[in-house]
């Protein structure tokens, strides 16, 4: 089966780590913003969507970039949304970026607002609406390993 997993997430969650661990367990590549933007001839959403559709011709994990919406009509696409407690996200950002609590909180709020605007602008939908995903995971509750186990367990039932 040509399984494609899309992972949408709030800024500061462990979604990148979840994607990497899934990649190792499933033996498929992860494509993120940096990879996708590197493949673009221009920065239009339509071009980005074409790149994502091309990547989805083979088993892979796509992190962000409205991939769940871009691939919504394709078979064998499994959409995951990762969220986490705001304070947990701030703590992760503080550690990763060496920021104060206030700086990390500001970065989180700015990034979340930008992601919400980008998603709405390009899809007409509300970012983070769990109705757009097969599975929503709070990694504050289950951790990175728990999230990976949940996703793998869900996939075993498909």
Region locations from a protein language model:
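Pre-Walker A (Motif I) flank of P-loop NTPase domains
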Residues: 1-5, 58
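Conserved beta-strand scaffold positions in the cores of enzyme catalytic domains, especially
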Residues: 30, 77-79, 134-136
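Small-molecule kinase domains that catalyze NTP-dependent phosphoryl transfer to phosphate-bearing small molecules
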Residues: 41-42, 100-145
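ATP-dependent NMP and nucleoside kinases share a basic, alpha-helical "lid"
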Residues: 54-97
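Post-Walker A helix-loop "phosphate-sensing" segment adjacent to the P-loop in P-loop NTPases
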Residues: 25-31
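Short, amphipathic alpha-helical "lid/cap" segments that border enzyme active or binding sites
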Residues: 45, 49, 144-152
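ATP-dependent small-molecule kinase phosphotransfer cores
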Residues: 34-59
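Glycine-rich phosphate-binding P-loop
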Residues: 7-22
């Amino acid at each position: 089966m040509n399984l494609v997993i899309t992972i949408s997430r709030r800024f500061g969650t462990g979604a990148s780590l979840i994607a990497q661990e899934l990649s190792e367990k499933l033996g498929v590549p992860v494509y993120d913003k940096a990879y996708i933007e590197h493949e673009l001839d221009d920065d239009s959403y339509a071009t980005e969507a074409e790149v994502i559709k091309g990547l989805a011709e083979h088993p892979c994990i796509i992190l962000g970039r409205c991939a769940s919406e871009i691939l919504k009509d394709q078979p064998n696409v499994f959409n995951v949304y990762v969220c986490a407690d705001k304070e947990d996200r701030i703590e992760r950002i503080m550690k990763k970026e060496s920021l104060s609590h206030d700086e990390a909180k500001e970065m989180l709020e700015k990034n979340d607002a930008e992601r919400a605007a980008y998603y709405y602008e390009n899809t007409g939908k509300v970012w983070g609406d769990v109705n757009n995903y097969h599975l929503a995971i709070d990694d504050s509750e289950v951790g990175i390993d728990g999230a990976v186990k949940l996703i793998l367990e869900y996939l075993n039932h498909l």
